[in-house]
A protein has these predicted regions:
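N-terminal signal peptide c-region/cleavage motif recognized by signal peptidases
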Residues: 14-19
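Outer-membrane beta-barrel "beta-signal"
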Residues: 307, 311, 340-357
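Residue-level detector of the transmembrane beta-barrel scaffold of outer-membrane proteins
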Residues: 25-27, 76-78, 113-115, 167-169, ...
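Extracellular loop and loop/strand-boundary signature of outer-membrane beta-barrel proteins
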Residues: 47-51, 143-144, 175-176, 243-247, ...
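Outer membrane beta-barrel
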Residues: 21-36, 50-175, 183, 191-199
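Structural signature of outer-membrane beta-barrel domains
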Residues: 33-37, 84-88, 121-125, 175-177, ...
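Transmembrane beta-barrel architecture of outer-membrane proteins
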Residues: 58-62, 98-101, 152-154, 184-186, ...
């Protein structure tokens, strides 16, 4: 259950004739799962089965604080601070802090708004509804191919607006390097039209130095969804290209995805998806695994059962051909899966639970 407090703004300002009220909400998601994955590379460079507990299989585990204040005449001020949690060990992610988001925004009804700080890219925002798993589920969707490693960026200014069925996003992230304005900077934009039966989305993302061995990465994507009755059919395409500094690193790719979400009952949802990636490597070394890579494919199946509006049980399975699960060996080890030498594919199955509050 969300906890809310009402705090008066202008406390101690005797000259204020009236004080606005700030609505503060503490919220979070707890998501934990147990997983079995085949053909993982062992420390001795062999092949083995991985059995582990993980966090954030359906949605990333997190806690956060958000606050909003109505300023009058349609104006509104917002702030959000959000931090990751690893449910299997209780730790944070990376350097800690509010890694998932830390931004302050100002908006006006009918105009849209602007947010400042660490936040998601425009492409991430727009394509969330065109993820077959409905929100970039790591079990098992190649999120790295869709949104990239830079799906959150620091020092960002983002414009957002929702005009009925049309949503717009655009952002710029400052690199902050003296004498080199574009170094480490990022930019992007996207739009979505969500009609009653059909939805379409398109987006572009550009970033300098977002991942190791890459000096410039750009991607553009388009997707569509059809909602006939209890089913949602989704298909998308993304092209990415990079300026790289190391042989064997992905320099260009074409990524395709398609799938369906089907509401079997009000509590039960079935998901099926297919993913394919056409990969080109920079200066591959002859006679090595990086020379002429086989284009990977993956099939994903998932079942979600809602225990309540905020509690969910899920089971997921995936099989990847010619790649690690979620194409991790081509997507900069986005989720930590590997593929043992001499193996042609990898399978995974997981059972988990998610609770929102």
């Amino acid at each position: 259950m969300k906890k809310q407090w009402l705090a008066a703004c202008g406390v101690g300002l005797a000259s204020a004739g009236a004080s606005a009220q700030t609505n503060v909400t503490l919220y979070g998601v707890a998501d934990i799962y147990t997983e079995v994955v085949t053909h993982q590379q062992t420390p001795a460079q062999g092949s083995g089965t991985l059995v582990r507990m993980g966090s954030g299989g359906r949605s990333g585990s997190r806690w956060g604080i958000k606050a909003a204040e109505e300023l009058g005449d349609g104006w509104r001020a917002d702030v959000r601070l959000e931090s990751s949690i690893l449910m299997n060990n209780g730790r944070g992610v990376g350097t800690g802090g509010f890694d998932r988001g830390a931004w302050l925004g100002l908006s006006r009804q009918g105009w849209g708004g602007v947010r400042f700080g660490r936040q998601y890219t425009s492409l991430f925002d727009i394509f969330e509804h065109y993820s077959v798993t409905d929100g970039y589920s790591t079990l098992y969707e190649p999120d790295g191919a869709i949104v990239g490693l830079n799906f959150r960026e620091n020092n960002m200014v983002k414009y957002y607006a929702d005009f009925g069925r049309l949503s717009l996003r655009a952002h710029y992230s400052f690199g902050g390097t003296p004498g080199a304005f574009s170094a480490g900077a990022g930019s992007g934009f996207g739009f979505e039209y969500a009609g009653g039966l059909v939805g379409i989305a398109a987006g572009y993302d550009d970033v300098n130095g977002a991942v190791p061995n890459v000096t410039h990465f750009r991607r553009y994507a388009i997707a569509a969804a059809i909602h006939p009755g209890p089913a949602t059919f989704i298909a998308g395409f993304e092209h990415g290209s990079a300026n790289v500094t190391t042989p064997g690193v992905v320099t260009r790719f074409d990524f395709y995805w398609a799938g369906v979400r089907y509401r079997v009952t009000p509590a039960l949802q079935a998901i099926g998806a297919f993913y394919y990636e056409n990969v080109v490597l920079q200066n591959p070394s002859p006679g090595t695994a990086s020379a002429g890579p086989s284009n990977p494919k993956q099939v994903t199946l998932e079942m979600d059962y809602s225990l309540s509006k905020s509690a969910l049980l899920y089971v997921a399975a995936g099989y990847a051909w010619r790649a690690a699960l979620d194409f991790d060996n081509y997507n900069y080890n986005f989720l930590g899966y590997s593929l043992a030498s001499g193996r042609s594919g990898s399978a995974g199955v997981a059972l988990g639970m998610r609770k929102q509050f």
